[in-house]
Amino acid sequence: FSNFPSGMPALVKSVNDLGLKLGIYSSNGTLTCEDLPASLGNEATDADTFAEWGVEYFKYDFCHNVPIPMRAPYIEYISVANSDGSFETVIPADDASLFGDAKILEDERLDSGRYISGLSAHRGSALFGVDVPEDGEYSLTLGIRKKSNSFKYLEVTVNGEDKYATTVPPTKGFTADGRHQVKIKLRAGANTIELENPIASRQDSAAVQYAKMGRELMRATAEYADRNGTEERP
């Protein structure tokens, strides 16, 4: 703000008063091309900030990009629980419907002895069915067979509509199993939970990342306009 002591909203207004629109720049990376802080991993925060400033155009670069991993975790089971712990259900790998290259492998180091492989690089998916007592937010726990000390990516699709993206950090240790949690929303009664990694190339990764920023910008501008009773800026 040293260059714009009145703040960014005032700058936008000054530019608008000249009959012009103001845009801003960031990068789909950890840093911009000038090695300044960028938006990858901070999409929601940056979108909210740009909406509050009143920014009307946006240029999104590709410097210092970190691609989404093509590798998916191996799944031993999933469990679903509500927030107060009064409900929990565990669904083993054997109860999933498998598609594409997804398959069950045996492993004596796991309590269940089995896990799902083949979910990486858009090659396969696993579909679980789960019944819950009421609408609401639930904790989805992924029981993971730990292999490969690397980041892994998974998309969780609930009832064929709502998508939750999650990155599983590198896992190592003496035990063969691990856990990773995702908050999801379910409806009372029957639900489906599909697991897959749709990233099969760097192009796929970029498309998913750019789409995420686009969604956050549209959400942020709509929410800001609704809160302040103003026209929604593009």
Where are these regions (language model features)?
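Short, solvent-exposed loop/turn and secondary-structure capping segments
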Residues: 25-27, 33-38, 69-71, 153, ...
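A cross-domain feature marking catalytic cores of carbohydrate-active enzymes
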Residues: 24-28, 62, 197
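Aromatic- and glycine-enriched glycan-recognition loops and surfaces
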Residues: 1-27, 40-44
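Extracytoplasmic
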Residues: 72-219
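Beta-sheet entry/capping signal
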Residues: 21-23, 192, 232-234
